[in-house]
């Protein structure tokens, strides 16, 4: 257990898994502790871009953003990664805000199965979703749960 809160938990996950120059995949609507972690570890981010409505309110990240080919395209387009081969590099971590400040939830099992083995560590920032593990309504909408299969290759973190 961490008594300092989720910001510290997020930084602990990142400092444990990420090294300078690592490619990381991050929710563009992430918490500032993730931005701090990017800076402190020296990681190079590619961002998953959420939708916005005509009032500018942030919505969900489209499913297509989680496609491996889409992530590789983001790596190729990032000027900080011009010397990185998008076909061979494996992102060190993917961090997703789950749920968002507006209550958007993602099906974590879908994301885990899509990225398992491509991204080494799957990190779900669940600071706004601690109750999900205690109610069946949320099913696969939280990162870890009883009697749910583990990833074959990637490590999953929930903070």
Question: Model features per residue range: what roles?
Answer:
Residues 4-159:
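Conserved PLP-enzyme active-site core in the AAT-like
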């Amino acid at each position: 257990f961490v008594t300092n809160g989720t910001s510290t938990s997020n930084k602990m996950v990142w400092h444990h898994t990420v090294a300078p120059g690592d490619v990381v995949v991050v929710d563009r609507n992430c918490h500032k502790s993730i931005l701090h972690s990017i800076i402190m570890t020296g990681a190079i981010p590619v961002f998953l871009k959420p939708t916005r409505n005509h009032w500018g309110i942030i919505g969900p990240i489209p499913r297509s953003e989680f496609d491996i080919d889409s992530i590789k395209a983001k790596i190729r387009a990032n000027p900080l990664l011009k010397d990185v081969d998008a076909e061979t590099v494996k992102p060190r971590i993917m961090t997703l805000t789950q749920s968002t400040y507006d209550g958007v939830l993602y099906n974590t099992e879908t994301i885990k199965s899509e990225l398992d083995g491509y991204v080494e560590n799957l990190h779900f920032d669940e600071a706004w979703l601690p109750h999900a593990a205690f109610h069946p309504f949320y099913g696969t909408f939280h990162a870890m749960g009883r009697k749910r299969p583990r990833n074959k290759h990637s490590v999953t973190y929930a903070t």
